[in-house]
C-alpha cells in the first residue's frame, strides 16, 4: 500500500515521504495513529496544501522535546528495590518503574520512551538508560538501583 507520512517514522521516512508498506502495517498502526494517509491523488493534493502547517507543528514538537531533553540529560534517578546479600534484586527494575520515578520528578514520560538495551535491571548499582523524547532526541539518564535488605 502506498502511503504519505504525516510525521517522521523511524526506519520508514520523514514528513511528506510517499512510501510503500505492507497493508496490515498501514491499516493497523500508521493510519489509526495519524502517522500516515493513503497516497491517493486527492490525499496528496490535500497534503501539499497542509504541508507548511504540518512542518511547523513537527518543528514545535522537536523544539519542545529538545528543551525537555536539556532538563533531563545527565539526571540521576534513585530507585529502591528489595535485594539479596549478593546485590541481586528480588524482581527487577523495568522501564515502567523508571518512567514512574521520572514522573515523580516532574517529567511526563510513557514507559515506551524509556529504552533499556540490556533488558530490565536486576543488579544493585548505577545503570545508564536512554530516554527517547522524540525520534531525533534521545537522552541518557543514570538509574541508581539501591538495595533494601530483607
UniProtKB/Swiss-Prot annotation:
Classification via HAMAP family: Ribosomal_bL9
Keywords: Ribonucleoprotein, Ribosomal protein, RNA-binding, rRNA-binding
Organism for this UniProt entry: Cupriavidus necator (strain ATCC 17699 / DSM 428 / KCTC 22496 / NCIMB 10442 / H16 / Stanier 337)
Stated role: Binds to the 23S rRNA.
Superkingdom as given in the UniProt entry: Bacteria
The protein, known as: Large ribosomal subunit protein bL9
InterPro entries documented for this protein: Ribosomal_bL9, Ribosomal_bL9/RNase_H1_N, Ribosomal_bL9_bac/chp, Ribosomal_bL9_C, Ribosomal_bL9_C_sf, Ribosomal_bL9_N, Ribosomal_bL9_N_sf
Protein family per UniProt: Belongs to the bacterial ribosomal protein bL9 family.
SUPFAM superfamilies, per database record: L9 N-domain-like, Ribosomal protein L9 C-domain
Molecular function in Gene Ontology: rRNA binding; structural constituent of ribosome
Matches recorded under PANTHER family: 50S RIBOSOMAL PROTEIN L9
GO CC terms: ribonucleoprotein complex; ribosome
GO biological process: translation
Pfam families named in the record: Ribosomal_L9_C, Ribosomal_L9_N
Amino acid at each position: 500500500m502506498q502511503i504519505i507520512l504525516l510525521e517522521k517514522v523511524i526506519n520508514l521516512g520523514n514528513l511528506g515521504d510517499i512510501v510503500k508498506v505492507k497493508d496490515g502495517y498501514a491499516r493497523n498502526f500508521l493510519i489509526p495513529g495519524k502517522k500516515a494517509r493513503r497516497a491517493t491523488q486527492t490525499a496528496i493534493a490535500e497534503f501539499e496544501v497542509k504541508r507548511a502547517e504540518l512542518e511547523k507543528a513537527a518543528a514545535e514538537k522537536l523544539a519542545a522535546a529538545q528543551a525537555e531533553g536539556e532538563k533531563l540529560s545527565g539526571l540521576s534517578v534513585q530507585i529502591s528495590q528489595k535485594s539479596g546479600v549478593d546485590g541481586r534484586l528480588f524482581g527487577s527494575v523495568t522501564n515502567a518503574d523508571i518512567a514512574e520515578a521520572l514522573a515523580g520528578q516532574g517529567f511526563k514520560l510513557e514507559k515506551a520512551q524509556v529504552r533499556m538495551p540490556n533488558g530490565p535491571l536486576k543488579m544493585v548499582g548505577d545503570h545508564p538508560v536512554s530516554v527517547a523524547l522524540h525520534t531525533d532526541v534521545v537522552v541518557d539518564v543514570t538509574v541508581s538501583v539501591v538495595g533494601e535488605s530483607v
